[in-house]
């Protein structure tokens, strides 16, 4: 798992209070990890702060899984 993936996983665990083994790259924030719309907004803000990237609303709407977040952050940080 990449450094970005590890950091995303840590943020998800802290914000959603889920078990680490549930946070896989395929895990959906809403369907698999029990996040609601407010949780997803808070996660995006936490990702922006942690990685120093800006995630516009239209992009945030496409980040549905842990893997989506990792891919977007890696691309935005490149």
From Swiss-Prot:
The modification O-(pantetheine 4'-phosphoryl)serine is found at residue 37. InterPro entries: ACP, ACP-like_sf, PKS_PP-bd, PP-bd_ACP, Ppantetheine_attach_site. The keyword Lipid biosynthesis applies. Keywords: Cytoplasm, Fatty acid biosynthesis, Fatty acid metabolism, Lipid biosynthesis, Lipid metabolism, Phosphopantetheine, Phosphoprotein. It holds the Pfam family PP-binding. Its main location: cytoplasm. 4'-phosphopantetheine is transferred from CoA to a specific serine of apo-ACP by AcpS. This modification is essential for activity because fatty acids are bound in thioester linkage to the sulfhydryl of the prosthetic group. Pathway: Lipid metabolism; fatty acid biosynthesis. It is found in: Cytoplasm. It comes from the Bacteria. One of its GO terms (cellular component) is membrane. GO terms for molecular function: acyl binding; acyl carrier activity; phosphopantetheine binding. GO terms for biological process: lipid A biosynthetic process. Residues 2-77 form the Carrier domain. Carrier of the growing fatty acid chain in fatty acid biosynthesis. PANTHER family: ACYL CARRIER PROTEIN, CARRIER DOMAIN-CONTAINING PROTEIN. Belongs to the acyl carrier protein (ACP) family. This is Acyl carrier protein AcpP. It comes from Mesorhizobium japonicum (strain LMG 29417 / CECT 9101 / MAFF 303099) (Mesorhizobium loti (strain MAFF 303099)). The gene is acpP.
